Structures are given as C-alpha cells and as structure tokens.
Amino acid sequence: MESLSPFIIKSSPERFDVIVVGSGITGGWAAKELTERGLKTLMVERGRPVEHGTGYVGENRDPWTMPNRGKVDARVAEEQYAVQRQCYAFDEHTKQFFNNDRDMPYSTPADRPFSWIRGNQLGGKSLMWARQSYRWSDLDFEANLKDGHGTDWPIRYADLAPWYSHVERFAGISGGKEGLAVLPDGEFLPAFEFNAVEQAMKQKFDAKYAPARMIMGRTANLRTATEEHAAQGRIQCQARAQCQRGCSFGAYFSTQSSTLPAALKTGRLRIATNSIVHSVIYDPKTNRATGVRVIDAETNETREYHARVVMLCASTLGSTAVLLNSKSDAFPTGLANSSGVLGHYLTDHLWSAGADGRVEGFEDDYYQGRRPTGPYIPRFRNVVDKHPNFTRGYALAGGASREGWQSAAWKPGFGKEFKAMIRKPGAWRFGLHGQGEMLPRFENAVSLHPTKKDKWGMPLLHVDVTHGDNDQKMREDMADTAAEILDYLGVKDIRKTISTAAEYPPGLAIHEMGTARMGRDPKTSVLNGFNQAHDVPNLFVTDGAAMASCAWQNPSLTFMAMTARACAHAVDELKAGRI
C-alpha cells in the first residue's frame, strides 16, 4: 500500500459526498464501496495513523528481543490497561493497538462490570481481530419473530446472500462447503487441515452426533491467494500465529491490507486521523445530517466536516455514543431516537464455558506450523428439538495440540536427562469451548454519564449489562455438553470450566451488538433494513450497533456484508435525489 501521508488531512472546506466515521472492518468496507462507486469520501478516525507493514512494530520480534520478553510491565498493565489486558491478544507485541484505559475511561455500575476492548487507530480492531468468518442463516434472522425476544429483523438471509459472496471473494475466507442449513456455505478458499488427533475426533463425533458435525473453522486468512488477492499485494498465510501483531504479508483481512488500498486507488478518499467525532451536525429545516463536529485528539481544537451523507462505522458502542451526544430540540435524547430504543438491547456473545482434557496415544504424530483456526461444531441446540431449559443456541470451538517444553516447568529433574526430556513433545490435549447467543433485553443499555467527562470534555459512556437467566442456563449447558462430548471421544482427566461474571465479564467476547437496532417499525427501532435511520434518511449506521440480535456466530462477516449492501443503497438513494 502506498504511503498514507498524501491522503491525510486536517481541516477541509470541501463538502464531501459521504463522511465515514471509523476505519475498522465496517469503515474500511464503506470507504472501498463508496469510492469505487464514484463518491468523494472522508474517513474520520479518532486514533493515530498506522501504515501497513511499517506500523506493525511488534511483528517478527521474538520475545527475547523485547524489553519485557513479550509481557507488558505489570504496573503499566494495571495502571493504564486494566481492561485491555484481559484480552487474549494483549501483550508487549500488540499493546500499541489497544486503548489506554486511563486516558479513555468509561463507567459501569460497581457490581456489574463490563470489559470494553477497544483499538482506536487507523484500522481499528481489524488489525487484531480473531478472523472467524461465518454467514448467518434464517434460523438467526427469524428467531426474534418466532420466540418473541427482540424485534423482528427487517431482512432475511436472501437479502444478504449476494453481499456475503461479494465480501467473501474480496476478503478471502478459507473454509469448506458443508451443506449445513444452520451455517450457509460461501465463496471459500481451501480450508485449513485437521491434525491427526482432530481428524480422529471428527470421525467419532460425526458418527455419533449426526446431523451435528465437526468442521474446520472458517477464517479470513488466505490459505491460498487468488489473482484478486495478489492484486491487493497479499500472499498466502504463513501460519505464524502472529496475526494480532499485524501482518506485512497481508495474509489476513484487515483495513490496511485490503479495503483501504482499494479505496485509495480510486483517488476519491481522504482520511482525517486523530479526529474524535463529538456529534453529528443536524439541520432541522431539512431533516438531514450535514456533517460531523470533531475534536482534535492532539490539540483539543474543534472543527467541522461536511457531507451529503453521514455513515457511522465507529464500533457498536462508539457509534451509539456519537448518536447519544448528538442532541437537539428535535432529538433531545440523541439523534434519530424518536423510538426511545437508542442505547438499549446491548448484547455480547456468551463465552468462557467448556471443557478440555488429555488425549492418550498419537505419540508419533505432530503438526506443522501454527494454523490460524481450529475445529468448530456449529449450532445444534434448538435447531429441531427444543431444549427444555433455554432458547437459542451456541457453537463449540477448540482443537488439539501437544504440550511443549513449558510443561516441564513443574516437573522435577536436572542436567542431561532433564534436558533430553524437555526436548520431547508433551501429551496431546483436546478442548471445546462454547460461544452462545445472548438474548436482547431492553435493560441492557448504554447511556451518557450525567457528570463524568473524558479529557476532551465529552461525557463518559456508561455501560450497564448483565446476563439473564436464559444466558446463564445456556452457559451451563455449554460446559456440560463439552465435557460429555469429550468423554465420549475418549479424552481423559477432563476439566470442566465455567467462569462467573466477575471472572469473565460481558464484553470479553468482543462481539458487542445492538444499541441502535434495525427493525420494521420506526416506533421500536432506530434503523431500517438498509441500516438507514428511520428519522434522518441520510444517516446510516452499519456496524454492530445495527444488530437486532447477536445470533451465535462471529459477526464480522455479517457486518461486512451489511455495510456493502448499505453503501449500494446509499448511492442509489443519492442518485435518485431522495437523500
């Protein structure tokens, strides 16, 4: 990718066609789709610029070359990254991609913690996401209507199917075609392979639990690179397990590796970094958004950018915070909030429940590389038969690996024999852990704190969310079922785990959804089926805030497809003169 410098601006008198707020997975896609359709677009990012390749300062660095051997100084982590350090991807190699919690706080009730994992820089969390990429199905889009939890989705799978294909081909998704109704097939590159233990487990599982099936997880890593990916400057995955540090090979999908170069190539994109969007500018005479108010993150100076369309892609809670802060006489509780549901129905996937254990045999088997995905069991609960204790469902994911030399840390020994022992691979282990659907509930909400402000003078976001009874019963079933499956598969010394909310608060699945949901009725939803605000027709929200429920699959691929579809609709509406 060419240098970003020529495309970065501060102030601009120009009226753009579209302002895109945010530069992560959805912001990158919006910039690509809009510029390729001929629109002059401004991408506004609150964080610093990050160049592809040279900006990945932790990439290719072995732990012993780092000042703290790959770990973050304990005092720094506690004082500045108390929340971010809970993320699996946070370490000395990646710290620069995570928010400083001391500088960018938020609030929660004292007895209801929420862990908000954030990455405010150009590229957002697309630089360190887990890359699991799954289509949703009508089982998910029809669930609210059928069981009465949440509002009916205004779209169905058929509305998104061509857009799933569109984004899959460009992003590059590795996976296998399985013919499962609960998990539709897509436009896939070859799947990664099972290791010997996983293959044996798959055969036993598929035979016992059909129609449920163990498949290889679908991931936005290039198992092979097509001509389209080569044209983006990307090559196949090197299986280094360093994805969250940034990848100079462009082997996994990110804004920097994929959508941003495509947008810049058009010549129609400009980027405003270190620009914190305070609010959306609204004209009550025309009932239109006319731009955004911005605070410079470095100088505290204020400025405005103007456009014909405003598209919020600032993350679920980021976009909702902007809308809540965009108050006027017409919208005293937040822009486009005539329904009163803005900020409500927050969800995050249910996690941290499962089981693992020791596998006997396979001493002569090993594996090559560090595959970026693993075995995956798509949803099987409440697909045909109704579970007596809870509604909706979950997936199980995991894998098999061999213990390494670190396992010898607690073993006795010394000298030549001890060294020889730790050179040998340890025992095989196999585990499965759940990811389930949290029900949308009005009381799970975010709001602006009435008195507390950040260092830029903006109200802190206040997050109040808890798991409900259905959520907890599902998590219990995740752990019980994972242990039951492992026992049938012959795994020994099984350890069942299920964390409490204090140990593993909501938010740590890093799949926040809802708070500006789409729906059919403007009285009960913020957006229509094209991610367009019911109240303000030239305002769009295409990130996780738009979701009417959270399903059980990782949501990023659906965010991409929705964004591409919304952009096409926005362009059509502009050309028709309706917005």
Regions picked out by a protein language model, each given a short descriptive name:
Residues 215-223, 240-243, 272, 278-282, ...:
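A glycine-rich dinucleotide-binding beta-alpha-beta segment and adjacent secondary-structure elements
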